[in-house]
């Protein structure tokens, strides 16, 4: 077993900014002999299975309080020590956490991506690199509409309503201010090969 501490990279930004794509691009450039994983912060949404579907639709999923922070901190701390963790699985269509989990252990590079990836002080302290993805809001909205309608069984009207009522306001109030915690801000309205190259070079230098 590799005893060297794994690299933890945090990627934050607005909903639809391209965090998942950027995370996957980073992982794709890592050498095959280096183990890696992308963890979506949405996995740590608080399970509201006790509520009916109508009640769950009233929850503000874009507020920091919608996440189970203690579990997130514990699991990221454990995986940094190469301990095995069981990451929850969140179902976007039913809006509840599933009973099954994903087992992750002994990886060299961990990427956590989510709107609040660099929001929490405890998680920031154990991270090796904190990235904020900057994408124009109108582009984020277009991407979110396409994703939620095609992949998450949402109507166009519901996506727009949620954007206006919670997504955009919570970005302005909580997500955008967390940018001050980032080591690097990346423009991602287009494919930023320079940023990817520099981050890949950084990973190779410290690993």
Swiss-Prot record:
Molecular function via GO: ATP binding; cytidine kinase activity; uridine kinase activity
Keyword tags: ATP-binding, Cytoplasm, Kinase, Nucleotide-binding, Transferase
Key word ATP-binding present: yes
GO CC terms, sorted: cytoplasm
This protein's record includes keyword Kinase: yes
Catalytic activity: uridine + ATP = UMP + ADP + H(+); cytidine + ATP = CMP + ADP + H(+)
Domain of life: Bacteria
UniProt pathway: Pyrimidine metabolism; CTP biosynthesis via salvage pathway; CTP from cytidine: step 1/3; Pyrimidine metabolism; UMP biosynthesis via salvage pathway; UMP from uridine: step 1/1
SUPFAM superfamilies: P-loop containing nucleoside triphosphate hydrolases (SSF52540)
Main location: cytoplasm
EC number(s) given by UniProt: 2.7.1.48
Example GO BP: UMP salvage
Transmembrane segments: none
Binding site for ATP: 13-20
Residues annotated as signal peptide: none
Enzymatic class: transferase
Compartments, record wording: Cytoplasm
Entry's family note: Belongs to the uridine kinase family.
NCBIfam families: PRK05480.1, udk
Annotated protein name in UniProt: Uridine kinase
